[in-house]
Amino acid sequence: MALNIEEIIASVKEASVLELNDLVKAIEEEFGVTAAAPVAVAAAGGGAAEQTEFTVELASAGDSKIKVIKVVREITGLGLKEAKELVDNAPKALKEGVAKDEAEEIKAKLEEVGANVEVK
């Protein structure tokens, strides 16, 4: 090879924008490649965007209904009567539009006392 890498880099540094554009086109034609950014690769994952808001749903109270009612009151701030109605009428949404971390925390608290919980 007549030119070493340092000489090629020095030549590229000295070239004008038009000359560099011609160089890119010549390389694309010679090697059958394109200098375009691979945008299609990022879009190929497409589909649904990652979900950021979740709904915590009480599927059933399980065996320890009283403990579940206490935790539901703590989580939702409902009164005793409202929390009992919510638990009795399961499946019901407890909290909507919460972050993933908060939803997982709520689920863990409820499952700890025997409830069946779904995060959607």
Swiss-Prot record:
UniProt superkingdom: Bacteria
Quaternary structure and partners: Homodimer. Part of the ribosomal stalk of the 50S ribosomal subunit. Forms a multimeric L10(L12)X complex, where L10 forms an elongated spine to which 2 to 4 L12 dimers bind in a sequential fashion. Binds GTP-bound translation factors.
InterPro entries: Ribosomal_bL12 (IPR000206), Ribosomal_bL12_C (IPR013823), Ribosomal_bL12_C/ClpS-like (IPR014719), Ribosomal_bL12_oligo (IPR008932), Ribosomal_bL12_oligo_N_sf (IPR036235)
Protein name per UniProt: Large ribosomal subunit protein bL12
Gene Ontology cellular component annotations, sorted alphabetically: cytosolic large ribosomal subunit
HAMAP family per record: Ribosomal_bL12
Organism: Listeria monocytogenes serotype 4a (strain HCC23)
Its job: Forms part of the ribosomal stalk which helps the ribosome interact with GTP-bound translation factors. Is thus essential for accurate translation.
Gene: rplL
